[in-house]
Amino acid sequence: MSPPWWRRSTHVVLAVAVIVLVAVVVAVAAVMTSGGDTSSAQGAAGRPRASASPAVVPVSDSAPVPTAAGMTAALAAPVADPNLGNLTGRITDAKTGTQLWEQRSTLPMLPASTNKTLTAGAALLTLDRDARLTTTVVAADQNSQPGVVVLVGGGDPVLSAAPPGQETWYRGAARISDLADQVRQSGITVTRVQVDNSLFSGPDFAPGWDPADIFGGDIAPIQAVMVDAGRTQPTTDESRRSTTPALDAGRALAAALRVDPATVSFASSPPTGQQLASVQSAPLIERLRQMMLASDNVMAETIGREVAKATGRPQSFAGAVDAVTGKLASSGVDMTGASLVDSSGLSVLDRLTAKNLDEVVGAAAGPNLPAMRPLLDLLPIAGGSGTLSDRFLAGDARTSSAGWLRAKTGSLTAINSLAGVVTDASGRVLTFAFISNDAGPTGRLAIDALAGVLRTCGCGG
């Protein structure tokens, strides 16, 4: 008999429902965009109408398990694509944990953003899903520093400087305007704003990061308080980032309080005065969703520090990495071969094995760590959401995977990776991880084709 979690888990059922619904949407979209001339419409009128009936479809208890031989045969052609470069991978039956295929799956490779699956998994194991980060404004010593208030960073990187009613990039973001309103209501006459950036320790830029990525919009220095994750254009995904995000947050508060932003500076020590204002971030589960769907590097680094704090480690790059890998390892997830310097996967010094990644996804799909199960729902949907919204939409195997495959992507120069879950043609749920280093110019298409085979293949023999 199957474990009860497999048949009745709310998260698994919801995930399957979403996958089926997206598959229907993709199919309908394909029909609607296949041609709009009159002759096509007239021809279609004579054909039987297709029925689109999305529904919650439970995973079959009796679906056949793919064989290793069948899997190897099905993957032979896509694995041979030279654009995959140096490829490692692993495929596992989600229900039993049986390894079905592997290629050098214990070889450490540069994982890129699939590293975020570890950060998300450890966060789900460690933190409350409703956990929020609090940013405060505290009065400095009014005897020695009259009129000075201190913006105290609580680790939230996505405070919004947008005025009330204006959309922000991050759903549910706390607002500088709310802090300013509360400070005004306190009755203090503000003359200057300082910033307490002391929550995080160590460097704010990880080894193996390229400073050019600040201007390319991929990252900013990781500081204890930030506005819009350091974006200089708050509602643009690829906006260049700031090199001084904490001071920018202080300047935004100063401007909202009609104080000269040019006078903003760092506080010399944490303030001990009266708290004047506070705001809270979105809940952890929403922040994880944003991190995974958009592959948000800044969000990943700050969530890693939350895990570090909860496990008694320094809120630094090293502390976060130790906390994330340590929590997973102590929970039974194999971290052998993992060597990381950040929580986002942006560093070229990061190394993970395909087995590490597949074990994380497998733990989310398996019976032993139910706290990790929401990870499946956080993964982008092929052809439907996040970083997979424009992938798996061309080519036979890739198109058939749209709506059925969910995976975290990874992409750096000549690096492509995928780690996720898919239901095969026989109704069997498989987990997988592929890492391609030294990839060719069509490496991303090649790794998508490889993953796409898992959907079309029953692989029973």
Residue positions per predicted region:
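Mid-domain, small-residue-enriched loop/turn segments at the edges of structured enzyme/sensor domains
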Residues: 86, 145-223, 230, 261-264, ...
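C-terminal region of N-terminal signal peptides and the immediate post-cleavage residues
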Residues: 24-60, 132
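Small-residue-rich helix-loop
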Residues: 100-102, 308-461
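A small/polar active-site loop signature that marks catalytic segments
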Residues: 221, 227-374
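N-terminal export and membrane-targeting signals
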Residues: 1-22
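Active-site SXXK
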Residues: 97, 111-129, 225, 252-253, ...
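Beta-lactamase-like hydrolase cores
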Residues: 43-108, 178-187
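Short, well-structured active-site flanking segments
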Residues: 126-140, 261-267, 371-376
